[in-house]
Amino acid sequence: LRMFGNVPSSRPTAWNSYLKSIKHIEIEEATLTGSFASYFRGTDFPVLESVRIEQCNLSGVTSFEMAFYNSGIEKVIIRDNDYPKAPSLLTATQYMFSLCRNLSELDLSGLDTSAVTNMYAMFQNCTSLEELDLSNFDTSSATNMYAMFSGCRSLEKLDVSNFDTSSVAHMQFMFEKCSILEELDLSNFDTSSVTNMSYMFQLCPALKSLYLDNFTDAAIMTGMFAGTTSLTYLFV
């Protein structure tokens, strides 16, 4: 399925008869407006394998909440997009890729997250994802990162080194069950606003090196390192 021109957030009813047979969606040189919450979810697109959103105007998108929730999708490319009406209107990405258990290729370099406040469980249980580069993510407005990467059990490399976390209050379960991740650099994290870090690194048995240079204690830190049995280098 190829889409271009003006793409509204409400899907045409005429699509309903063939949604269940669509495997690939390409949106190119289009203008997207409104809320795309649950737009590509697995219950509506049961055989969807890939989505590409490229060279589009995304400045009118307000939400990607649960956009790919529980999808069998394998590849998502969102890159080289334009935001001519700055600032971005996108405020919600919670559960965006949650339960995308087959997702193995993800490029979000063209997603403007500068206004996003809620990243709750954004990548939760992306169990096939091995690498995730979020070095270009603007998280300056984010307040909630609860369980953001929880259950990413195949993740070997995660780059969150440029995250601005100065407004984040919730980090509980953020990296829980990232079971083969060996190194994590959070030296740039500002945790001065964080109230809850409970179980943040729980059940990360392969984690050996953890950089927490700028961390400050939160009010709640219960079980923060529970199950981090290989932790050898902790830099604080």
At which residue positions do the language-model features occur?
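Short, well-ordered alpha-helices that flank and scaffold nucleotide-derived cofactor binding pockets
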Residues: 41, 66-69
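Structural signature of tandem-repeat unit edges
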Residues: 1-6, 19-32, 45-62, 71-91, ...
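Extracellular beta-strand-rich solenoid/capping regions of secreted or surface-exposed proteins
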Residues: 10-18, 29-41
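Register-specific detector for alpha-helical tandem repeat solenoids, activating on a conserved position
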Residues: 37, 65-66, 94-95, 120-121, ...
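Acidic, Ser/Thr
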Residues: 41-43, 202, 226
